[in-house]
């Protein structure tokens, strides 16, 4: 494996190489490559998001985050269907992420619920045909981030321009990297494989219904940062209940640990560098291969932003409440939903 090829590995792949190193020299080399990868990734991400903020305005910095996330994920990940169809679908997904979150923010919670369900139905059914690719962690997360950081007026016009450019970049990178791959499915096949007896379809329906419902309840209860609860629910919903229970435990414990660590840093560090706590969290996520540790470090960035608006106490309270509510509601909802669907139609295992 070349130096460049090793740089392309994810955290789990890099840590596997480290674990299986036979000599100290080999382990030091893999450690060096891993640290270079983290450094290069952080510098690139920081530069990309900073540039997008300068061009599109500070209110649209989240556009840079969403576009960067899509490019980095879909340069390797696929949708499981023909490349040409997938490319058009990616363009459609960007349209949905640009229009629907903004439209939902203009409506009261109940009409917004319907908009969110319709939008997530397209993203999940066509973008997340293989649950184990975890494309929902890109598409639904991107949707929720844009929903949570909505803008209006001139800023929204700039957001449209930024998302259009992001769609073009993502589609070009995706097509270039996947054009020579063969896929058996097309868009019609994806629709035909929708089956209420399959574990995949049940999981998709849980995502489509539960996440918007969590957002709606959070809004009806006047809970700020409703997107946090939605993101927590999305992250916890998996095809199998045993996996969900594990995720829920790790999410709750990870967020509480993250809140404690953030609070310690908040009091130890001078106010002038509070904004950089989020970068520390980003580095931590890059070094983490396990979901529990990722939950810890993901808390840093969210709290660094929220603390500016709500203060430390308010941000910490919101983070814990929203995350516990999101994952617990998702667990209960999916347990009931899976039970009802299993009674109506026996589980059918499928090849994804």
Where are these predicted regions, by residue range?
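Alpha-helical transmembrane segments and their membrane-interface boundaries
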Residues: 2-137, 141-300, 304-352
């Amino acid at each position: 494996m070349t130096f460049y090829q090793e740089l392309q590995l994810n955290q789990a792949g890099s840590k596997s190489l480290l674990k299986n190193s036979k000599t100290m020299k080999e382990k030091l080399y893999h450690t060096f490559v891993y640290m270079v990868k983290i450094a290069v990734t952080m510098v690139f991400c920081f530069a990309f998001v900073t540039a997008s903020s300068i061009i599109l305005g500070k209110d649209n910095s989240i556009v840079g985050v969403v576009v960067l996330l899509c490019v980095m994920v879909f340069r390797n990940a696929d949708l499981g269907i023909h490349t040409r169809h997938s490319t058009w679908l990616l363009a459609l997904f960007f349209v949905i992420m640009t229009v629907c979150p903004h439209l939902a923010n203009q409506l009261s919670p109940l009409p917004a619920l319907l908009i969110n369900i319709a939008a997530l139905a397209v993203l999940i059914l066509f973008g997340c045909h293989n649950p184990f690719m975890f494309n929902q962690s890109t598409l639904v997360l991107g949707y929720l981030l844009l929903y949570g950081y909505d803008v209006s007026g001139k800023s929204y016009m700039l957001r449209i321009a930024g998302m259009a450019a992001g769609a073009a970049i993502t589609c070009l990178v995706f097509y270039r990297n996947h054009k020579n791959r063969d896929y058996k499915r097309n868009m019609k096949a994806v629709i035909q494989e929708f089956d209420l007896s399959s574990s995949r379809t049940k999981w998709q329906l849980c995502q489509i219904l539960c996440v918007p419902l969590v957002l709606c309840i959070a809004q009806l209860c006047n809970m700020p940062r409703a997107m946090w609860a939605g993101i927590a629910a999305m992250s916890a919903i998996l095809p199998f209940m045993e996996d969900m229970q594990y995720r829920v435990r790790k999410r709750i414990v990870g967020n509480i640990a993250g809140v404690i660590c953030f609070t310690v840093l908040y009091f130890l560090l001078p106010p002038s560098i509070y904004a950089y706590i989020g970068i520390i969290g980003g580095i931590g996520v890059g070094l983490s291969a396990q979901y529990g540790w990722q939950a810890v470090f993901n808390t840093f960035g969210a709290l660094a932003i929220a603390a500016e608006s709500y203060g430390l106490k308010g941000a910490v309270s919101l983070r814990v409440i929203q995350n516990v509510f999101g994952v617990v509601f998702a667990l209960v909802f999916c347990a009931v939903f899976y039970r009802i669907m299993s009674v109506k139609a026996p589980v059918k295992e499928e090849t994804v």
